[in-house]
């Protein structure tokens, strides 16, 4: 198990946007943290009321958004216009190219969300978009599959051999990790104990094939687990 602490991440403050970068991104460059397997980006973003990312383009990337607090408004040139709220998972396959914008839907409250980039298995595909809601009850005290290559169990589909799980753990709740190959565990908020180590908000742990782990002692914790080929 290799732990990457929250305070080891890159950070950028643009006034309207405060962003932590788990892996190298924009002006933050660390050759030792360019990604993990197909997982390329985990950015924890806080966006001021009424602000956001204007129209910009992407190609050949699987982009997943996960809202923690507030409301995020998404628009793209495929004709999609949606508002995301906590518990929602959005997947956009950029493929041959997509133009989109993401804004804080509120003029009063902040927006806190994760943007995740995953390298695609196939390049040059037709761009597509998908958004689904995952109620608290489906994630409380257990792992809920929210993204997968085949879209099974009601998850959003991703153009890569990856399984993404979300879980909520409180009052000492615990859970064994689902079967995984390479695994990246990211604590979104709260605290958990993993193999005797306490991980807090923004902390992460990487596991190699054959390494086993379980979560214990969850306290108001929200956790994402990536199972990667």
Give the ranges of each region predicted by the language model.
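Jelly-roll (double-stranded beta-helix
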Residues: 1-229
